[in-house]
Amino acid sequence: MIAPLANSAVKPHKSASFVPRHVAIIMDGNGRWASARHLPRIAGHKKGADAVKTTVRAAAEMGIEVLTLYAFSSENWRRPASEVADLMGLLRLCLRQEMHNIKERGICLKVIGDYTRLDQDLVALLNQAIEITANNTRLTLVFALNYGAQDELVHVTKRIAEKAKEGQLDPENIDVGTIESLLYTHDLPPLDLVIRTSGEKRLSNFLLWQAAYAELLFIDTLWPDFGSETLKAAVEEYARRERRYGGL
């Protein structure tokens, strides 16, 4: 945990090795951004969608391999139905507008979480975007939709129990690799950096297993104000840290 990032100019990286392969962002602060401007919450979400576009572009330019965005948690269903509808409508609109741009820019789209609970037309749009971008390699963009880390671990536990019951897995052979092979993120590189905006300092049920040895960065910037310079500053901070993975 560090102090909020300064708004100073960012120096170029010395080497691509300083760039994290896998960055995840808890995009927080849309509502507060809107409230501060006496605007409806949907205005903050729309501005947040613009920040997503800017950040995806910046991540690709910086050489980040995977960008995972906490777009809609399994707990977000508790929000007012009108706000949930607005969020789903915004996601639907963005997918329709950006799907082919994403494909042309070499971005591969993936989704983690039980997104089949979303409206069926939205599920179809997501599946279409996943399919047409599957062979892209410039950047993998992962949306966490109807995602909760505790639900993910329950899902993994059930899968392991089923395999053991069917004789496909000896309980004595269950290890870290067994669990990781069944996570939603099993085909992604290890998580290097988690960024949370808006000043809140918690993970909110996001990638709890994957974040075991990730660097955590909490910044005061509200998500709608997040941009390429903010991401560069976060990567600069990551590059200054020494990752020990429990060692000395």
From Swiss-Prot:
Q: Which UniProt keywords apply?
A: Magnesium, Metal-binding, Transferase
What SUPFAM superfamilies does this protein's entry cite?
Answer: Undecaprenyl diphosphate synthase
Per its UniProt record, the required cofactor names are: Mg(2+)
Q: Name one GO molecular function term.
A: magnesium ion binding
GO CC field: cytosol
Kindly indicate whether the keyword Chloroplast belongs to this entry.
Answer: no
Q: Which residues hold substrate?
A: 29-33, 41, 45, 73-75, 77, 79, 196, 202-204
Q: Which Pfam families match?
A: Prenyltransf (PF01255)
Q: Which residues form the active site?
A: 28, 76 (proton acceptor)
InterPro entries given for it? UPP_synth-like (IPR001441), UPP_synth-like_CS (IPR018520), UPP_synth-like_sf (IPR036424)
Query: What biological processes does GO assign it?
Result: polyprenol biosynthetic process
> Which Gene3D superfamilies would you find in this protein's record?
Decaprenyl diphosphate synthase-like
Q: What does the entry's cofactor note say about binding and number?
A: Binds 2 magnesium ions per subunit.
Keyword Aminoacyl-tRNA synthetase in record = no
Binding locations of Mg(2+): 28, 215
Domain of life from the UniProt record: Bacteria
State the EC number(s): 2.5.1.-
| Family of this protein | Belongs to the UPP synthase family.
Matching NCBIfam families:
PRK14830.1, PRK14834.1, uppS
Listed under subunit, the entry gives: Homodimer.
What this chain does, per the record? Catalyzes the condensation of isopentenyl diphosphate (IPP) with allylic pyrophosphates generating different type of terpenoids.
Q: What is this protein called?
A: Isoprenyl transferase
Name of the coding gene: uppS
